[in-house]
Amino acid sequence: MSAKAQNPMRDLKIEKLVLNISVGESGDRLTRASKVLEQLSGQTPVQSKARYTVRTFGIRRNEKIAVHVTVRGPKAEEILERGLKVKEYQLRDRNFSATGNFGFGIDEHIDLGIKYDPSIGIFGMDFYVVMNRPGARVTRRKRCKGTVGNSHKTTKEDTVSWFKQKYDADVLDK
């Protein structure tokens, strides 16, 4: 045993992957975007409402303007792999947050391997990945809540190094 044993509690893992398509209007385009997310994830997406009225964009408060779906487990890793393949395994440094999460967007959903359907059209989407370590549940549970120490919290540097090592990817500076 020449190498020091790695603590399994320090391993980073993907907690969830959130796929979001923001259409900007309710109606037919929103239902078509919903079909795209359902094809991709195999789950029924949720519609998101506008927080406030923006007259210049023609958006009213509480109008449904986007759809999103949360994917966990091996399915999340598989969809993330497809999304990173579209981005050619390159992300920018500013795609990573200080808390260790990261996100990116793609322009066309058909790049993910979904067959083009003229009745649906083409939609871009955002990928948001939430990272954590084992033991993060103690801050979220209802009974006997606890805190996670600073050394165990997920940081940007941890996630960037995990991302480079797991996907053999590049993180561009600017």
Curated annotation (Swiss-Prot):
The modification N-acetylserine is found at residue 2. Its main location: cytoplasm. Keywords: Acetylation, Cytoplasm, Methylation, Nucleus, Ribonucleoprotein, Ribosomal protein, RNA-binding, rRNA-binding. It is found in: Cytoplasm; Nucleus. Gene3D superfamilies: 3.30.1440.10. GO terms for cellular component: cytosol; cytosolic large ribosomal subunit; nucleus. The modification N6,N6,N6-trimethyllysine is found at residue 75. InterPro entries: Ribosomal_uL5, Ribosomal_uL5_C, Ribosomal_uL5_CS, Ribosomal_uL5_dom_sf, Ribosomal_uL5_N. One of its GO terms (biological process) is ribosomal large subunit assembly. N-terminally acetylated by acetyltransferase NatA. GO terms for molecular function: RNA binding; rRNA binding; structural constituent of ribosome. Pfam families: Ribosomal_L5, Ribosomal_L5_C. Present with 39000 molecules/cell in log phase SD medium. There are 2 genes for uL5 in yeast. Belongs to the universal ribosomal protein uL5 family. NCBIfam families: PRK04219.1. Component of the ribosome, a large ribonucleoprotein complex responsible for the synthesis of proteins in the cell. The small ribosomal subunit (SSU) binds messenger RNAs (mRNAs) and translates the encoded message by selecting cognate aminoacyl-transfer RNA (tRNA) molecules. The large subunit (LSU) contains the ribosomal catalytic site termed the peptidyl transferase center (PTC), which catalyzes the formation of peptide bonds, thereby polymerizing the amino acids delivered by tRNAs into a polypeptide chain. PANTHER family: 60S RIBOSOMAL PROTEIN L11-RELATED (PTHR11994). Component of the large ribosomal subunit (LSU). Mature yeast ribosomes consist of a small (40S) and a large (60S) subunit. The 40S small subunit contains 1 molecule of ribosomal RNA (18S rRNA) and 33 different proteins (encoded by 57 genes). The large 60S subunit contains 3 rRNA molecules (25S, 5.8S and 5S rRNA) and 46 different proteins (encoded by 81 genes). Component of a hexameric 5S RNP precursor complex, composed of 5S RNA, RRS1, RPF2, RPL5, RPL11A/RPL11B and SYO1; this complex acts as a precursor for ribosome assembly. This is Large ribosomal subunit protein uL5A. It comes from Saccharomyces cerevisiae (strain ATCC 204508 / S288c) (Baker's yeast). The gene is RPL11A.
